[in-house]
């Protein structure tokens, strides 16, 4: 498992005093209220201020005090240590932990490995890459078991839930 988790990406500057506009990459963007620090380019940096504007976070970090300094950080990812992550509910997983898991069905057919998780308003979708790409809706009647120790996800056979043209 990864020790660091990505929580956002700096997408622009905000104002002249080093504040930055951040695209949150976490389900609950209000989690920034509780961060004492973030990891920026491998270094721990204290969070001095957090504001919200529409669907973005305005972040002020210690040591970044001008628009010029903030400008250099555009497109940089913000990370936190796993121990500072929010506590997950049962049957919830961080995307970074699901990526690379092998997906098989109850008949033993191997579809491939999870390349990414697509988040949609109704449910997540596993993007599985093997001999061909398959999109697997993350629904209780399709995804039957997730074994993180073995990095193995068991689903119902695709013929039972996937329709072909």
Swiss-Prot record:
It is found in: Cytoplasm. The keyword Amino-acid biosynthesis does not apply. InterPro entries: PRC-brl_dom (IPR027275), PRC_barrel-like_sf (IPR011033), RimM (IPR011961), RimM_N (IPR002676), RimM_N_sf (IPR036976), Transl_B-barrel_sf (IPR009000). GO terms for molecular function: ribosome binding. It comes from the Bacteria. Residues 90-161 form the PRC barrel domain. The keyword rRNA processing applies. GO terms for biological process: ribosomal small subunit biogenesis; rRNA processing. Its main location: cytoplasm. Belongs to the RimM family. An accessory protein needed during the final step in the assembly of 30S ribosomal subunit, possibly for assembly of the head region. Essential for efficient processing of 16S rRNA. May be needed both before and after RbfA during the maturation of 16S rRNA. It has affinity for free ribosomal 30S subunits but not for 70S ribosomes. Binds ribosomal protein uS19. This is Ribosome maturation factor RimM. The lineage of its organism: Bacteria, Bacillati, Bacillota, Clostridia, Eubacteriales.
């Amino acid at each position: 498992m990864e020790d660091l988790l990505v929580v956002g990406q700096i997408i622009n500057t905000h104002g002249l005093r080093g504040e930055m506009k951040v695209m949150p990459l976490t389900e609950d963007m209000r989690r920034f209220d509780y961060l004492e620090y973030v990891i920026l380019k491998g270094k721990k940096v204290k969070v001095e201020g957090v504001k919200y504007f529409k669907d973005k976070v305005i972040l002020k970090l210690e040591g970044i005090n001008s628009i010029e300094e903030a400008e250099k950080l555009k497109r940089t990812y913000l990370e936190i240590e796993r121990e500072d992550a929010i506590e997950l509910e049962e049957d919830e997983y961080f995307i970074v932990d699901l990526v690379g898991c092998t997906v098989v069905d109850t008949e033993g057919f191997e579809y491939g490995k999870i390349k990414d998780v697509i988040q949609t308003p109704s449910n997540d979708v596993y993007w599985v890459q093997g001999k061909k790409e398959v999109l697997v809706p993350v629904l209780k009647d399709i995804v039957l078991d997730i074994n993180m120790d073995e990095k193995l996800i068991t689903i119902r056979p695709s013929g039972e839930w996937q329709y072909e043209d």
